[in-house]
């Protein structure tokens, strides 16, 4: 699931919603959003976390982008990396997750392509 800090951020964006009173009302509308998640094991909840973030994007009328349909094991909703079976530094473990990094790269490419289509 999403972290407490991310949930807190999401809750504080109420002023950006359609019924908000902020000068930034609709501030996230039509923005492109792609999701990344890191978990302790492959397919151990990263997909559900990404879906929660995508639901937030949809509430704000954002354009949700996934990592594409390229045939690869991993997550198609966004970028999903794992730290398993590495112990120690999370960054080093993620850098060894070739499948997760591929899904994250695919997501970045798809976000860039979507932005180019909107120009």
Feature locations, PLM:
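Glycine-rich phosphate/pyrophosphate-binding loop and the adjoining helix
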Residues: 63-119
């Amino acid at each position: 699931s999403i972290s407490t800090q991310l949930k807190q951020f999401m809750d504080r964006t109420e002023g950006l919603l359609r019924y908000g009173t902020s000068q930034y009302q609709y501030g996230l509308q039509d923005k492109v959003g792609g999701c990344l998640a890191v978990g302790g094991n492959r397919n151990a909840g990263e997909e559900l976390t990404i879906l929660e973030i995508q639901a937030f994007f949809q509430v704000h009328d954002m354009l949700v982008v996934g990592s594409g349909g390229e045939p690869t094991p991993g997550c198609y909703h966004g970028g999903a990396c794992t730290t398993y079976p590495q112990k120690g530094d999370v960054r080093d473990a993620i850098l060894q997750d070739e499948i997760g990094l591929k899904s994250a790269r695919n997501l970045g490419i798809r976000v860039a392509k979507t932005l180019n289509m909107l120009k």
